[in-house]
A protein has these predicted regions:
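Conserved pre-catalytic core of RNA-dependent polymerases
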Residues: 1-131
Length: 133
């Protein structure tokens, strides 16, 4: 089921990402990006131009995706309600607890984050990150 959702989601969001967005995208691996950066640095040197690079490391980025904002972004992107509804249902009523040395704490609702290891999460995160940039 997740593969079907992923294929449908990709159809909508691929045109939302700029060509320079490479993270979590098919055919845009790390090696290609390293070659691109190397070429840019080389050309800057040939033309004696300064070049500035900025690399971002999103620490625990998947953990901070706000669900309500994500649903709004999906709607603004024009993703059809049935697909958005399915995605919302995947995240509805999630709860967690922690086990400590003294037992477990009370259950609490999870309102942020995309699922770690889920094939939909990279696409959802990219859409969220592109929107907030």
């Amino acid at each position: 089921m997740l593969k079907i959702l992923q294929a449908r989601l990709q159809r909508y969001v691929n045109h939302e990402f700029p060509d320079v967005q490479a993270g979590f995208r098919k055919g845009r691996g790390t090696r290609v990006q390293i070659v691109n950066i190397h070429w840019i640095i080389k050309k800057a040197g040939e033309f004696q131009k300064n070049i500035y690079l900025c690399f971002m490391d999103y620490v625990k980025a998947f953990d901070y995706v706000d669900h309500n904002k994500l649903w709004g972004i999906l709607q603004e992107t024009g993703i059809l309600d049935p697909l958005t509804c399915l995605l919302r249902n995947l995240y509805a009523s999630q709860e967690a607890t922690f086990r400590t040395g003294h037992g477990t704490i009370d259950w609490f609702q999870i309102r942020k984050g995309v699922h770690q290891g889920c094939i939909l999460s990279p696409c959802l995160f990219n859409l969220y990150a592109e929107y907030i940039m």
